[in-house]
């Protein structure tokens, strides 16, 4: 719905849009990226405290235990994200554990797979960077078109899948004149 904040949930993670919460809490304010990050951290701190106190209550009331080890904490603030499927996403992180950063975090996408062609990984990483930087679609399409036009001039080492055959040295050609 229009009021949904949660974007992605996994076993131990939740990604939510804090922008609607900030806009509701601080209406009619023009916020710089730094101010927006500070406001998000304030709200995250409140949510974190509330959830952790709820776990204290839950542990005592429903499990009859005084102490539990479950602890919620805010880890990153991302300016943008691309969520494909479960455990496959990319984030442009601007704050990591309270430190200002500008980095891309990738989970499960082909840009980090070791058995994916280097040229394709580079292209996909550049396209992901463009998407997360809100580059217009036309410019991204042009990047892909240029890559496709230049593919035939790329060396096979960067176009081939970087895989090997285990124990290939034990296979030898018996007849030097025979192709097979």
Where do the PLM segments sit?
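DNA-dependent DNA polymerase catalytic subunits
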Residues: 1-11, 18-180
